[in-house]
């Protein structure tokens, strides 16, 4: 049995206003070929299928076109869970129809833990694999707010809720497995931030919950999970040094900070040891680059030298340029655009640190929204309105709660008498 673990497609994502439809299409075409080549039986996509809870028609077309074609590769089952960027109701809406294609979608946490336990069968109808399809767990799914509770109380209850949810789903899987003639491997999924997880600058990874204590440790996953397929972090990595708990990472670089990162997916097979336990054998499958990204920094001569070298290579490259020279170059954009004119290079972003430093010295900050995240914008507002520093922590925490509420809201859900 061959299982392929991927995540964080972020279909519909742009890069500084540049659409990436061709990249996504190329990846999905390559993925179909990969599924055929490696005779994949089960494909697991661990959340953030889309980049937004209201995906555009082009992103939807890519998604459904892929699902319509994947059956022809010989892949018997596709398991998709919702991530924090996804709309649970949007993913779940066609779940009944997709089930007829052996595509199993769990967009949000279920009331009954057993409803998240998928028993997958082989071509002969024999049980082959159990998947505990745990999606991104929203605050409202696992914690009841109480008046007067402190920040640390909220964070602790959140962690307890995550642990309790996984424990309940794990117990349900063990019950199902115990009822089979022969036990089968158990895979758990999740879209979560593991403690110690590695991120990179500009990857767009959002905080999932208010506060940092909700970074879970490997011990949150039940011992019955023979492999844990995680999503949310874009860097391929193990969790807590445990080989069987992994982030596959995103298939495309989500920002220039990931430009030099080798993207991959996890090919998982199971062996049985002397004690009868299922042991995952994991191979990383490298993903090719569909659109080269390059980050260039240095003085103006250094930048120009590198740009000329890239022009000579003739490869299509998207660029981020960081000017760090000491000389003030007010027409940097014009000079660089002239240098790459008519070439295969496209400069998507230029950061002129010398101009920014000069502006700071003149007390005229030249920051743009591209340079700041949501929290930093709020911090600038506090400073601009001369809010006393003694009030900053409480206001920042309240603002984080507002952001968490907005990001966690399902924009595609309909309000029908309180039902979504």
Task: Show where each model-derived region lies.
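Accessory, non-catalytic peripheral segments of nucleic-acid enzymes
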Residues: 37, 270-420
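Conserved catalytic scaffold of divalent metal-dependent phosphoesterases
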Residues: 96-97, 101-210
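Active-site neighborhood of divalent metal-dependent phosphoester/pyrophosphate hydrolases
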Residues: 10, 40-58, 75-89, 194-205, ...
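Conserved beta-sheet core of the metallophosphoesterase superfamily
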Residues: 194-269
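Active-site neighborhood of phospho(di)ester-bond hydrolases with catalytic His/Asp-centered motifs
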Residues: 6-7, 43-47, 77-84, 104-109, ...
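Divalent metal-coordination and catalytic microenvironments
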Residues: 8, 28, 48, 63, ...
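N-terminal active-site segment of His-dependent metallophosphoesterases
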Residues: 1-68, 75, 401, 409, ...
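Metal-dependent catalytic neighborhoods of phosphoester/phosphodiester hydrolases
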Residues: 15-16, 49-67, 82-101, 106-107, ...
């Amino acid at each position: 049995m061959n299982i392929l673990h991927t995540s964080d497609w972020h279909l519909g994502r742009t890069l500084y206003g540049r659409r990436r439809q061709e990249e996504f299409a190329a990846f999905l075409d390559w993925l179909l070929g990969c599924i055929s080549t490696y005779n994949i039986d089960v494909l697991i996509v661990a959340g953030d299928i889309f980049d937004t809870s209201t995906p555009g028609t082009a992103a939807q077309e890519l998604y459904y076109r892929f699902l319509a074609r994947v059956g022809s590769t010989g892949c018997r089952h596709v398991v998709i869970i919702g991530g924090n960027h996804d709309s649970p109701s949007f993913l779940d809406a066609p779940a009944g129809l997709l089930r007829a294609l052996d595509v199993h979608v769990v967009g949000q946490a279920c009331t009954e833990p057993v409803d998240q336990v998928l028993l997958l069968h082989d071509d002969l109808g024999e049980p082959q694999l159990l998947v505990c399809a745990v999606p991104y767990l929203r605050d409202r799914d696992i914690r009841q707010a109480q008046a007067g509770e402190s920040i640390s109380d909220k964070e602790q209850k959140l962690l307890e809720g995550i642990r309790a949810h996984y424990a309940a789903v794990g117990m349900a899987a063990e019950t199902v497995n115990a009822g089979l003639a022969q036990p089968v491997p158990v895979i758990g999924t999740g879209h979560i931030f593991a403690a110690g997880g590695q991120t990179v600058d500009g990857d767009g990874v959002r905080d999932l919950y208010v506060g940092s204590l909700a970074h879970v440790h490997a011990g949150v996953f039940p011992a019955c999970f023979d492999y844990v397929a995680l999503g949310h972090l874009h860097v391929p990595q193990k969790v807590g040094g445990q080989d069987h708990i992994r982030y596959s990472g995103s298939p495309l670089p989500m920002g220039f900070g990931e430009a030099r990162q080798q993207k991959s997916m996890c090919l998982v097979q199971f062996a049985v040891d002397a004690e009868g336990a299922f042991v995952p054998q994991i191979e990383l499958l490298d993903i090719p680059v569909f659109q080269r990204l390059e980050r260039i920094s240095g003085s103006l001569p250094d930048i120009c030298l590198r740009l000329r070298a890239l022009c000579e290579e003739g490869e299509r490259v998207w660029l981020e340029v960081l000017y760090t020279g000491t000389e003030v170059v007010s027409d940097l954009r014009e000079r660089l655009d002239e240098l790459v004119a008519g070439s295969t290079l496209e400069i998507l972003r230029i950061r002129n640190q010398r101009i920014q430093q000069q502006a700071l010295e003149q007390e005229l900050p030249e920051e743009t929204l591209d340079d700041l995240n949501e929290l930093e914008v709020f911090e600038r507002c506090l400073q601009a309105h001369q809010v006393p520093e003694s009030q900053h922590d409480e206001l920042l925490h309240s603002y984080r709660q507002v952001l968490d509420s907005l990001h966690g809201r399902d924009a595609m859900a309909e309000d029908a008498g309180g039902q979504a």
